[in-house]
């Protein structure tokens, strides 16, 4: 249920107006982007979310609601309310583990997602790369960073192998192991893009695991594994730059030292993969 209002409301106003019988249970602070909180009434639970990035355009949060509204409940939480700066979605019972599931199981989930109707908006990385450069700490901007940005701008993004709806933040902390199977949470980066971009963006433990995931996906999608892996590799420079830039951007926003450490580690990976 989208509810349009130009006036922001507080958490207490949200609960008293729309969920008067519910009460807060706990706050989630997992992940790098921020937290949300859980409300409950007689065993029914919802997750109340706010935009992770306070500087992001408002349409980005609305897009997340629209994506969840069209996705099947077997892979994503169902949304119940959207209004300015707030979204309420189903709580997904299950276990969130610290490691990825079996690659074949994960490949099945991603392949099923990629068979769904497209969302209607494209994921384009170059505008994000340029935004992160512009919004980063000037003291952290380097000639090497600018050189890589110009190189990618000149090269342009790889031509999509197959265009599908993507989640774009697949890691262990965003996967719920439920009784009915794997489900994905945190859809704030969702959009339409190349299936190989999704596979390239999965937070894997090592190259062997990555290759196996791509091979398992290729089998389901009836694509030659070597062809799919080549396309995945084409996205690596873009994704490493995206991660490094995002960490730099979040460092300037929050001052949290973890983002500097993650940014430095990603810059080292870029040097290794040159």
From Swiss-Prot:
Reactions listed under catalytic activity: thiamine + ATP = thiamine phosphate + ADP + H(+)
Similarity comment: Belongs to the thiamine kinase family.
Entry protein name: Thiamine kinase
Protein role: Catalyzes the ATP-dependent phosphorylation of thiamine to thiamine phosphate. Is involved in thiamine salvage.
BP GO annotations: thiamine diphosphate biosynthetic process; thiamine metabolic process
Pfam family, one: APH
Pathway terms, separated by semicolons: Cofactor biosynthesis; thiamine diphosphate biosynthesis; thiamine phosphate from thiamine: step 1/1
């Amino acid at each position: 249920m989208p509810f349009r209002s130009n006036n922001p409301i507080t958490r207490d106003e949200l609960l008293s107006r729309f969920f008067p019988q519910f009460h807060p249970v706990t706050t989630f602070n997992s992940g790098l982007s921020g937290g949300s909180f859980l409300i409950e009434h007689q065993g029914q639970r919802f997750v109340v979310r706010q935009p992770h990035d306070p500087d992001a355009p408002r349409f980005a949060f609305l897009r997340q609601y629209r994506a969840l509204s069209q996705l099947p409940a077997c892979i994503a939480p169902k949304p119940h309310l959207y209004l300015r700066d707030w979204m309420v979605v189903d709580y997904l019972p299950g276990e969130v583990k610290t490691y990825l599931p079996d690659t074949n199981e994960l490949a099945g989930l991603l392949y099923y997602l990629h068979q769904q109707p497209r969302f209607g908006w494209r994921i384009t990385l170059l505008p994000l790369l340029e935004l992160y450069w512009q919004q980063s700490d000037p003291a952290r901007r380097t000639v090497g960073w600018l050189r890589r940005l110009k190189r990618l701008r000149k090269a342009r993004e790889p031509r999509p192998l197959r265009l599908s709806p993507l989640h774009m933040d697949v890691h262990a902390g965003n996967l719920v192991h439920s009784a009915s199977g794997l489900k994905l949470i945190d859809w704030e980066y969702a959009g339409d893009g190349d299936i190989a971009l999704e596979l390239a963006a999965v937070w894997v433990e090592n190259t062997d695991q990555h290759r196996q995931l791509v091979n398992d996906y290729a089998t389901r999608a009836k694509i030659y594994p070597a062809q799919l892996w080549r396309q995945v590799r084409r996205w690596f420079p873009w994704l490493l730059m995206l991660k490094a830039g995002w960490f730099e951007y979040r460092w300037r926003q929050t001052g949290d030292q973890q983002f500097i450490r993650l940014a430095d580690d990603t810059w080292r990976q870029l040097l290794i993969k040159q």
